[in-house]
């Protein structure tokens, strides 16, 4: 423990250890002792589990903190005791917490005969000393055995201490007893002579030296001490003996017995300057003409000092003939603008409708809404000893929260103002009438502005422009016309929709085809490279094929080469058109379903010269000659753009005979289809079932690892999955690039780091 710290208190039950019971199991007759190894400390404790607060003031709410005086007894139940030791210089120790399981045990009662005799002996001396003899009291002591409840309540009342809250039910039982008041006087000396062997109760810890008393004794003590404390908040009774309400909680307090109103004190009489009548000087206004007496009580100075000028910068008084301050050398105001302070007389400011408030320290008249005096800085409206109730005008303590005479809340009222706002707050009429014509307003000549202290000030306006309404309207018209020109010049781009309308809306169908073709070209760099190479002429034929799952649209354009343009020879290209093959020469086939078979059958009859003229890059987009089985088609759909890549569906299709190396209509393997559509979770399933991870596809010969690298950040997870499946990182495409080279070319550091690992 560090030097100067306070030792934590110890909570010890005073009993002999009983076999079969834990240390925390006690009864209601077991006393608890609290002590600390540090000398000269006070111990504060609580019984409801809350933190002990020894700094809480009386009347500030419910107080559950008690000061330890002597061993205490706990009520039955599970009680949590928290204690803290506090030294005289307010150094605190740590808080000690102990939980006791208290069982009810009947109290050990003293026989009624012995108890009555001891009580009679204890109080007979007091009665003889005070000159009172109570025959009724002896009669009550004979029936003490029938009033055990008073003994219990007294046991709780015996240790009551100032600043702690008592049990309201106990006070109620004692306060509303039917026992009459036997002994009218109470002296502390008599109570101090009583034996002191009763334990301290947690609710009352400050009336020491009491033993179990009967109902008559308790009633006498309660009647004689109840007026000293408020029954609701236990705050001290107001010092005013005629106060009817508690100044802390506002509850009614009983009157003091035997007190009468004192005779009125003689007030100082004086002559009113307005009406000339002799009136008391302790009233704010004249009782005859209602003129204010505060200005009349201020003495007039007979000696005057020389004129001086107050510096506006530092507030120093300077002789009137000087032009610069002797302290700060600032420019002094001219003579016609100066404030003159002659002798001890303070300046008087102009008022509104003659309403002013006088300072209690210097007597200066201030504006009615001022909070502090303009001359001495004192707070206005607050006396040095008491505050005034705005409703009844009674004097209360400065810290009083409620008025002792009428009981209204006065905590927020810091000073008294003679206006209607306080009357609204207090809920009553104004305490004083409005000032009449006898109220003299104070007029001070206003200072004239100085002509020599004027300065020309300017502000920068360069660059600031505020357009007019016509100019704003003109700009709006120009912006509208510019938008119209842009709309006319821009190409028509149809809206990209998920499903085309069909049902004969051929224009919307063409817009749908155009929008999706543009989107497909933007997302596929290989297709962009192929579609950008050939030079096409006019569209010569177009066919549409439907097979129940897909819709195939074939467009045939005239291919234009540089040789045909510059030789200017007429060539019969009708035999070399692709439409002659797909459409059967001079006419179309009657059935669209035979289009693929007819094309595959006629391609073998095409001359060798036609085969040489064909672009070898277009073979990747030819239809797959091998028909797809239902399992392979469903597998490609699951890893395609419309699929979800569900592992359970893929495993079921592979179990049913789907080929993991099957290709779609574009010739892409299933692994590459899964990579392009970002179904990276399907790659390990296909690899375990025999899929070729390093299979190349397309005109550039890219593998699945190349395709995943081209996706950038979106394909980073696919790259990690392929590397986990032992994909060949040294595999090169037709351009001689590995997947790592593509990542470096794209500047993708995150993907490059995967290859480095």
UniProtKB/Swiss-Prot annotation:
Subcellular location(s) per record: Cell projection, Cilium
ANK repeat residue intervals: 631-662, 666-695
One cellular-component annotation, GO: centrosome
UniProt KW keywords: ANK repeat, Cell projection, Metal-binding, Repeat, Zinc, Zinc-finger
Main location: other
Domain of life: Eukaryota
Expression across tissues: Expressed in retina.
GO terms, biological process: eye photoreceptor cell development
Pfam families, A to Z: Ank_2 (PF12796), DZR (PF12773), Fn3_assoc (PF13287)
MF annotations from Gene Ontology: zinc ion binding
SUPFAM superfamilies per the UniProt record, alphabetical: Ankyrin repeat (SSF48403)
Gene3D superfamilies in alphabetical order: Ankyrin repeat-containing domain (1.25.40.20)
Zinc finger map (DZANK-type): 230-290, 359-407
Subunit structure comment from the entry: Interacts with NINL. Associates with DYNC1H1 and multiple dynein intermediate and light chains as well as actin-binding proteins.
Protein function: Involved in vesicle transport in photoreceptor cells.
Protein name listed in UniProt: Double zinc ribbon and ankyrin repeat-containing protein 1
Gene of this entry: Dzank1
